[in-house]
């Protein structure tokens, strides 16, 4: 085959690959949107409802590619908890203040150890459990009494 024909064939084959990758990218984007709407948002709504029973001021914001819940008590930030996704791997991010009022930021994992998980395998219950673990840890640090 002549070189220019091979070049033309190669060009059109690479276009097919690009379109296939674009479709896959769109699928993943759609799956991430579903993750936020079907797992993160219901978890945060449930948390908001329960935390407000204990006098907490709770704000939630969930979109196609982010989810955040902020908990304040008597004007003080107790925890800003976010669920983010890197590729298809979700992870929690927390922002809070220590007893001195210093802002602290931390990124974590939903499961302990080196277990692999993604948006398809992470459950609403795991999001709730992780939030509770982070929230209780922050409250203990924030409100514990110093000294004997």
Regions found by a protein language model. Name each.
Residues 6, 10, 71-129:
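Intrinsically disordered, low-complexity regulatory segments enriched in Ser/Thr/Pro
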Residues 14, 25-30, 68-79:
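Charged, low-complexity, helix/coiled-coil-prone segments
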Residues 14-55:
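Contiguous, amphipathic alpha-helical segments that mediate oligomerization or scaffolding
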